[in-house]
Structure formats: structure tokens, C-alpha cells
Amino acid sequence: FYNVGKMPDQDIAELARSKNIDIAIDLTGYTRNSRPGIFACRAAPVQVSYLGYPGSMGANFVDYIIADHTLIPEQSQKFYSEKIVYMPHCYQVSDNSRPFPEADLSRAELGLPEAGFVFCCFNHNYKITPREFDIWMRLLSRVEGSVLWLRRSNEWAEVNLKKEAETRGLDPGRLVFAEKCDYSEYLMRISKADLFLDTFHYNAGAIANDALWCGLPV
């Protein structure tokens, strides 16, 4: 194991080549805190994009992307510069070895009402468009006492989403925002919801996987 967090991209790539790494896998693509510069410097003869960024890198230094036919249907292949390696079923690797969190918080401790149906979407707020938000608000209006549990991405998104709920005739207090937490508590939180609502244009990936693993319908 080498801690290379503070090293420049070029130095990391040179270190990888000196260790005769055959395949380098990029798990983050163009997402936050990613380091595509390492791959631009050719850390390995074969470089693969996987899991964290399902779009094309659009770069000649990424040779392959691992996917399935749901993630990249045949009609979307033309939008990818990488060669696509298709898994036979699902491209995400799932297992049952993760321990379910022992800590258990009450609904009140999580900011939820003691009774009532809990819809949730823990995707980043920027994935929410007016189309699905309209649907979600109609759900809240038809399911008495229900709430929508969202991820707190930033204060501006929270203010704007509450404002949009109010313009649709709903009490903005029915939108509950969850603070960032560690992975164990995050899994425990998911298990407290009743239904995960996905976003249309930019779907949930690992989060949907986690929800299903916790027994939460998506």
C-alpha cells in the first residue's frame, strides 16, 4: 500500500509504472476529488473506467469502461470513446458480507415523524429536476402524513426545494434533509425509509444498490 494522496499526478503514474502495474482502474471519473490526471499520464498499459462515473471520459487515455446493457444500451454506444466491456447481468459487484449496522436511531432522532410513510431520495440534489419533483409533490399530497427524506447537499438547494414545495401547495416541513454521516449510519438510515424514489435523467447507482441491500424498494 502506498499513500499517494499528496503526490503530483505525474509522480503517481511513474510510481505505478515502476511497480509494473498492468491494469489501472479509475473509480471516480470526473466526480468530486477525482484524479484523472494520473490516468492522463498513463499509470498502466491498460486503463479502465468503472463504477463511480458511468459516462464516457471522452479521453484517449481510458481504454475500457465496464458496464451492463442497462447502463449502456446498444443505442448509446456511439457516445462512448472507450471500448465497452459488458458484464452478463449487473455491472455493480454486490455481496452480503457487509455487516448491518448495530446502532439504531429512532425516527425522531433522525428528524422524521413517528408515524407516516417515508419517501426518500439520497441522490445528490443536483439530480432532481422539476419533472420528478412534481411527481414527488403529488405523492405527498395524496399520502396523508407522508414526508420526503432528502440528502442535504447544500443550503441553497434546501431553501429552493422547500420553496418549490410551498409553491405547489405543500408544507415545506414535509421535506426532511439528512446530514452527512458515516457509512454505517447511512445504511441504518436507509432501512428507516419506506420507498426510495429515483431520479430520471441521472439515476442512482451505488445508492440504489445499498437501498436494495437494506431491503428498501426502489
Regions found by a protein language model. Give the residues of each.
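Conserved catalytic-core segment of nucleotide-activated headgroup transferases in glycan assembly
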Residues: H89-D182, R189
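A generic secondary-structure signal marking the coil-to-beta-strand transition
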Residues: V46, D63, K83, A115-V118
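Donor nucleotide-sugar binding/catalytic pocket of nucleotide-sugar-dependent glycosyltransferases
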Residues: D63-Q75, Y80-D95
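Conserved nucleotide-cofactor-binding alpha/beta core module
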Residues: F1-F61, H69-Q77, W149-V218
